[in-house]
């Protein structure tokens, strides 16, 4: 079959060759122009650049915008990664800070309670909190010291900072501590600097109220509350806490002891009062009955 010379590919193939050849010659000419070191050629190159480059500025603007967007995205990615890394480091630092504070508090308590048990010459005995034996209606804790360590009912307990409660129930190796927040707790206290006497009564709340204040107007929130020593219940001047006003407008005490972290308690040895064996000089002695011999001599 004879080929049809009127087909389009018979004309496009020579045209394609001509265009490719012309493009090669153009590129070769540009290369030669850029490589020739001559003043005239240099002027021609400068004129060509001044003519062509400004006309391509509109074409370079989108490319510049795209390049700027890519650079901004890369910068945002780097900032986001740095932010995430800083957040992780901040969380780790917070955890380390909390652990350091707990260790610092525990170390301070251990340093304050380092005189551990069983020497009768000590003024206090240190015990470890075994368990929280309290309930919604009874707030108390158990200690690992008891009668074998000389512990007795009624002795005050502290956590190294403030008063915690009193001993109520002593076994051979353990003892129970009734907390100041228990409803059965009644502690005579003094509010400083006014010197007002009051009774700290537990009501199962974290901040027990002050009762029987003579002059409540003299008491201000933030005043220091210590034991008064009245009645020989507790030694005087033991730190209890600070005065605070509750939501019910009653004067309450924000306890100094950290009830949320009771690990070690210091049991204060109270000095017993000497029993009174004679009436003393303030009470007159009854008159002695007359001797029988003296009575008979008078009759004779």
Curated annotation (Swiss-Prot):
Places the protein is found: Cell inner membrane
Cytoplasmic face residues: 1-17
Ranges of the Periplasmic topological domain: 39-300
Keywords: Cell inner membrane, Cell membrane, Cell shape, Coiled coil, Membrane, Transmembrane, Transmembrane helix
Coiled-coil ranges from the UniProt annotation: 74-117
Name of a matching Pfam family: MreC
InterPro entries according to UniProt: Cell/Rod_1, Cell/Rod_MreC_2, MreC, MreC_beta-barrel_core
Transmembrane parts of this sequence: 18-38
Location (main, coarse): membrane
Cell inner membrane as UniProt keyword: yes
Source organism superkingdom: Bacteria
Function: Involved in formation and maintenance of cell shape.
Name assigned to this protein: Cell shape-determining protein MreC
Organism per entry: Cereibacter sphaeroides (Rhodobacter sphaeroides)
């Amino acid at each position: 079959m004879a080929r049809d010379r009127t087909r389009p590919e018979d004309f496009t193939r020579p045209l394609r060759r001509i265009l490719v050849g012309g493009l090669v010659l153009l590129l070769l000419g540009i290369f030669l122009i850029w490589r020739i070191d001559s003043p005239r050629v240099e002027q021609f190159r400068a004129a060509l650049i001044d003519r062509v480059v400004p006309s391509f500025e509109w074409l370079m603007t989108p490319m510049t915008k795209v390049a700027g967007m890519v650079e901004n995205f890369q910068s945002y990615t780097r900032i986001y990664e740095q932010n995430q890394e800083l957040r992780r480091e901040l969380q780790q630092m917070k955890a380390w800070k909390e652990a350091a504070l707990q260790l610092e508090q525990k170390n301070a308590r251990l340093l304050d309670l380092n005189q551990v048990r069983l020497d009768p010459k000590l003024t206090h005995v240190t015990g470890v909190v075994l368990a929280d034996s309290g309930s919604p209606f009874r707030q108390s804790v158990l200690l690992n010291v008891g009668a074998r360590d000389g512990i007795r009912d009624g002795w005050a307990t502290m956590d190294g900072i403030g008063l915690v409660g009193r001993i109520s129930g002593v076994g051979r190796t353990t003892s129970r501590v009734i907390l100041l927040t228990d409803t059965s707790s009644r502690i005579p206290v003094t509010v400083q600097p006014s010197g007002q006497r009051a009774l700290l009564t537990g009501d199962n709340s974290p901040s027990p109220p002050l009762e029987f204040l003579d002059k409540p107007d003299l008491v201000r929130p933030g005043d220091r509350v210590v034991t008064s020593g009245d009645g020989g219940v507790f030694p005087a001047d033991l730190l209890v806490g600070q005065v605070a006003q509750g939501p019910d407008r009653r004067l309450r005490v924000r306890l100094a002891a950290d009830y949320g972290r009771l690990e070690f308690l210091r049991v204060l040895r109270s000095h017993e009062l000497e029993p009174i064996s004679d009436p003393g000089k303030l009470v007159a002695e009854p008159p002695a009955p007359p001797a029988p011999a003296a009575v008979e001599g008078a009759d004779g």
